[in-house]
């Protein structure tokens, strides 16, 4: 298994569309009050586990919800995140902007979250980004990292990036946990979910 530096992966805080059950993909919606609180909590977690911020790189997706999360989480650290296009959310094509119930009507596999069927459906959205293209951009990013790195990104990016780091197969990735307001710490081929 390829060895990578430690990662601290954050999914953006809750957005208005997350709350309403609308797929965002390449679109954006603002963080809710809860989302801003989640980002602040992630910042507290990071400050507890990173004693010397000069030893880490920090990257964020260029999409607004991730950038705002990074700004809130890094407040008081005197560091900003470098924006990296590889960390933008998967393009869900024609599903972007649709409610999850409409997507389930179009592809029943989306009704089974965190299963192989669900993951397969996610990457077969009409006019969306396929898994191999998505995986390639994330692997290129992962291989470019030289030191411990904080990454502020999106649900599916974090899901697949963490799976690649851990050496999981596509099928194994489906069983991972997700979440907002937490930090996924990856080190030496293992993952710990930091909640407090």
What residues fall within each predicted segment?
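Active-site-proximal alpha-helix that buttresses catalytic centers in soluble enzyme cores
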Residues: 5, 11-79, 129
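Short, well-ordered beta-to-alpha junction loops that form the rim of enzyme active sites
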Residues: 13, 61-63, 86, 153-156, ...
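Phosphate-handling substructures
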Residues: 75-137, 195
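Short hydrophobic/aromatic-enriched beta-strand-loop microsegments
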Residues: 30, 77-85, 169-177
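A glycine-biased structural micro-motif
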Residues: 55, 97-100, 105, 147, ...
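Generic beta-sheet signal
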Residues: 7, 56, 144-156
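Domain-level recognition of soluble alpha/beta enzyme cores
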Residues: 166-195
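Short glycine/proline-enriched coil/turn segments at helix->beta-strand junctions
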Residues: 74-80, 143-149, 188-190
């Amino acid at each position: 298994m390829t060895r990578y530096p430690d990662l601290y992966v954050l999914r953006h805080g809750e957005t208005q569309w997350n709350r309403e059950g609308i797929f965002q993909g390449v679109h954006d919606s603002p963080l809710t009050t809860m989302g801003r609180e989640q980002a602040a909590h992630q910042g507290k977690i990071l400050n507890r586990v990173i004693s010397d911020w000069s030893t880490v790189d920090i990257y964020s997706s260029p999409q607004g919800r991730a950038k705002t999360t990074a700004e809130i989480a890094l407040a008081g650290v005197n560091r900003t995140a470098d924006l990296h296009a590889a960390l933008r959310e998967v393009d869900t094509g024609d599903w972007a902007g649709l409610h999850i119930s409409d997507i389930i009507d179009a592809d029943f596999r989306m009704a089974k979250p965190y299963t192989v069927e669900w993951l397969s459906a996610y990457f077969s959205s009409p006019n969306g980004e396929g898994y191999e293209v998505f995986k390639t951009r994330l692997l290129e990013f992962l291989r470019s990292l030289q030191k411990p790195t904080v990454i502020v990104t999106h649900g599916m990016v974090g899901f697949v990036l963490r799976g690649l780091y851990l050496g999981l197969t596509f099928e194994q990735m489906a069983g991972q946990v997700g979440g907002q307001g937490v930090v996924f710490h990856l080190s030496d081929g293992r993952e710990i979910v930091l909640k407090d």
